[in-house]
Regions:
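Membrane-interface "cap" regions at the ends of multi-pass membrane proteins
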Residues: 1-62, 66, 73-77, 205-206, ...
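Juxtamembrane interface elements at the cytosolic ends of transmembrane helices
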Residues: 4-16, 49-50, 79, 225-245, ...
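Helix-loop-helix junctions that connect adjacent transmembrane segments
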Residues: 23, 62, 138-143, 172-302
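Select transmembrane alpha-helical segments in multipass membrane proteins
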Residues: 25-37, 62, 101-114, 147-150, ...
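Hydrophobic transmembrane alpha-helices that form the core helical bundles
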Residues: 48-56, 64, 73-152, 156-160, ...
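Juxtamembrane helix-boundary/capping and inter-helix hinge elements in multi-pass membrane proteins
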Residues: 56-59, 85-89, 98-104, 240-248, ...
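TM-loop-TM module centered on a large, flexible mid-protein loop between adjacent transmembrane helices
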Residues: 94-95, 101, 132-137, 252-317, ...
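C-terminal membrane-solvent junction of multi-pass transporters and transport-like membrane proteins
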Residues: 169, 340-350, 388-409
């Protein structure tokens, strides 16, 4: 990239934080947005949690999504502000380092690391059975584990080759996910309209309690939004690879949450309106695929499942990218074990190869001990909430002392 005024400004801002430019800056607004959008991956989150929502709170449970969107958008606004003030790779680790104490920053960095290492195999475990079904591979524990391990290996390899290739693939995945979600939403709305679907189903509580007793189940359904609308800060983790990062990243963070929230809400409404028989859906092991295939037919259903596979793969790949940058950011501060190895950037690929290999090894180990992982996978919901809480509390306490940069987001 030509080292013009914007590049020079990015370098000067980074040097103000006592870091030198080592990673190649090539990400622009869409690519930065794509990183955050893929990490959120509404396709992955909704497909994983729709069954829980529909069986816990009935069709009316989908409206908790709107509440979760508002809450996460407020968090995103704070993170966007921090990304504009401190445009350095490492997101919450770097922010809290300057808002609180080094110990709190170190703890936050390690919590973030644990979350990312756990969530990669968890995401790919969601891809495996869908891919196996499309390829007519028998769904067994051994086959699923092999698919997950191969997926993790491929995601790591793409990251080692370089951020440019990974970004190209991710940009394409975001495009296909967006087109797929919009297209499927329209098809489901049309199908529901053609069979004169009753809009009152959107307020049905199904087998759940009604009245004041419904408050508990409804609150539980918010877990879908809480599980899904996380990871938007991933674009901040690639700040040092982003052009004009202090303006680009904040816009990407807010846009990713806002558009994910809007697309997700319309998709949930369309899917719920298209329910052919509520009793059958409530008793189904896979309610959403059942609704899609019974409404649109086998061909369109499988076509969308291909898009689902692409979206989930991109989600895991982006998380791998984000994890590598976190390890790199912590290592150059000597806040990670064997920092002298993990802070190195490959001159050929402009990527933290050693850090990515560490992620690969740890994720393969987690996958091999999958029975233990299932007990830990709940942490992938708790850990980001803890990271957000620590960041927001640290920011609220230090906000009056934060120096805002003129011209920032």
């Amino acid at each position: 990239m030509k080292k013009g005024g914007t590049y020079s400004e990015d370098v000067k801002i980074l040097e103000a934080f006592n870091y030198k430019q080592e990673l190649k800056r090539s990400l622009k607004l869409f690519s930065s947005f794509a990183v955050a959008f893929s990490f959120i991956s509404i396709t992955t989150g909704i497909f994983t949690n729709y069954k829980f929502v529909i069986q816990t709170g009935g069709p009316a449970g989908i409206w908790s999504w709107a509440i979760a969107v508002v809450g996460q958008l407020l968090v995103a606004l704070i993170f966007a502000e921090l990304a504009g003030i401190i445009p350095v790779s490492g997101y919450s680790y770097q922010w809290i380092k300057r808002l609180s104490t080094p110990f709190v920053s170190w703890i936050t960095g390690w919590i973030s690391f644990c979350f990312l290492i756990l969530v990669i195999p968890a995401v790919d475990w969601g891809l495996a059975p869908v891919l196996a079904g499309l390829l007519n591979i028998p769904i067994s524990d051994q086959n699923i584990m092999i698919i997950v391990m191969c997926t993790i290996l491929l995601q790591a390899a793409l990251n080692i080759i370089g951020v440019k290739l990974a970004t190209f693939i991710n940009n394409g995945a975001v495009f296909t996910e967006t087109i797929g979600m919009i297209g499927l939403t329209i098809f489901l709305f049309v199908a529901a309209f053609n069979r004169n679907a009753d809009p009152s189903i959107l307020l049905s509580t199904g087998n759940a309690a009604t009245g004041t007793s419904y408050i508990g189940p409804f609150i539980l359904t918010m877990l879908m939004g809480s599980f899904t609308l996380v990871g938007f800060e991933a674009s901040a983790n690639l700040s040092e690879e982003t052009v004009n990062a202090h303006k680009t990243v904040p816009k990407a963070i807010i846009a990713s949450v806002a558009l994910s929230g809007i697309f997700g809400m319309f998709f949930l409404i369309a899917s719920t309106l298209a329910i052919p028989n509520l009793g059958d859906v409530l008793n189904s092991n896979n309610p959403l695929p059942y609704i899609i295939e019974s409404t649109l037919g086998d061909v369109l259903g499988k076509l969308f499942l291909v898009l689902v596979c692409i979206s989930i793969f991109a989600c895991g790949m982006v998380i791998t990218t984000s994890a590598g940058r976190l390890i790199y950011a912590m290592s150059r501060d000597n806040a990670f074990f064997f920092s002298q190895y993990f802070k190195k950037i490959s001159p050929k690929t402009n990527s933290p190869v050693a850090a990515t290999l560490l992620i690969l090894i740890l994720c393969l180990i987690s996958t091999y001990f999958a029975e233990s992982l299932t007990l830990l996978v709940g942490a992938t919901a708790v850990l980001p909430a803890l990271i957000y809480l620590i960041t927001i509390v640290s920011y609220s306490r230090a906000r009056k002392n934060v120096e805002f940069r003129t011209g920032s987001f």
